[in-house]
């Protein structure tokens, strides 16, 4: 018989309006990305201890949960009067890393369409892996876990409850995973839309027309630089000159002299044009 004495387990104080897990039994995660998150936590050795937080998550002991770039914070009500403060840290990707991710996602119409419609592409992990990044935590060391409770176990039941509700929050909003890594939904979608629009634009639209200095083209100053379409002058009636003559008052057979000369002027002009001017 062991001589080590452990205090009896204490019951947590009830919470009004706490965040309760939607699942009342069985697995908590519902979508592939939240299931993947839980699976990753189990793979890195946190699985057995996560079970301690299921009852806390389902009872609504988590008072608040917030996801920011690189940090998840929560308040969890335990057996003491003051709630415990939870912090789960993960390295957020930098601007240049996200720029590479967004460029790669934008190049694939399927990825862009899925994300713009609010869904997480099933092989999005491959995009990050191809750039030397990991969307989900790769090792336990990548996570920084902290709880203000006196329990020495890591993760304690308060951290475990937070992990479960974090997975459920990923069910509701898959972009929370990306926000945890440093990119908010609005920024990601705006950058994807801009990258798609920029990539679809003709290359000629982006080419700058740089004028050469005059000293670099003096030898071509009088040469034709480009074909210029010069509109032809409007056609002038061949008898327009007759219309400019003053009235002579002369007539023949009851017709003005200018009218009698008009056919002759027309014939003369036609003959001149046919001969090549």
UniProtKB/Swiss-Prot annotation:
InterPro entries: Znf_SWIM. The keyword Glycoprotein does not apply. A zinc finger (SWIM-type) spans 139-167. It comes from the Bacteria. GO terms for molecular function: zinc ion binding. Keywords: Metal-binding, Zinc, Zinc-finger. PANTHER family: SLR1429 PROTEIN. This is Uncharacterized protein Rv2102.
């Amino acid at each position: 018989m062991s001589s080590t004495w452990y205090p009896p387990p204490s019951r947590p104080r009830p919470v009004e309006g706490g965040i309760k897990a939607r699942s009342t039994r069985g697995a908590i995660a519902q979508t592939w990305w939240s299931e993947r998150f839980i699976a990753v936590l189990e793979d890195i050795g946190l699985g057995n201890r996560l079970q301690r937080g299921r009852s806390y998550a389902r009872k609504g002991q988590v008072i608040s949960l917030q996801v920011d770039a690189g940090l998840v914070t929560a308040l969890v009500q335990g057996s003491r009067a003051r709630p415990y403060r939870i912090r789960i840290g993960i390295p957020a990707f930098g601007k240049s890393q996200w720029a590479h991710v967004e460029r790669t996602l934008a190049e694939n119409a399927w990825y862009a369409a899925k994300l713009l419609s609010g869904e997480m592409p099933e092989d999005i992990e491959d995009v990050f892996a191809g750039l030397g990044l990991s969307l989900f935590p790769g090792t336990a060391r990548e996570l920084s876990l902290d709880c203000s409770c006196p329990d020495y176990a890591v993760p304690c039941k308060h951290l475990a409850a937070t992990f479960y509700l974090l997975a459920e929050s990923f069910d509701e909003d898959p972009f929370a995973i990306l926000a945890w890594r440093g990119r908010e939904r609005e920024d990601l979608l705006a950058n994807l839309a801009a990258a798609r629009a920029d990539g679809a634009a003709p290359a000629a639209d982006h080419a700058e027309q740089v004028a050469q200095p005059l000293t670099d083209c003096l030898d071509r100053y009088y040469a034709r630089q480009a074909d210029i379409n010069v509109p032809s002058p409007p056609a002038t009636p061949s008898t327009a000159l007759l219309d400019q003559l003053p009235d002579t008052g002369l007539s023949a057979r009851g017709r003005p002299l200018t009218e009698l000369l008009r056919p002759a002027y027309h014939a003369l002009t036609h003959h001149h044009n046919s001969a090549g001017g």
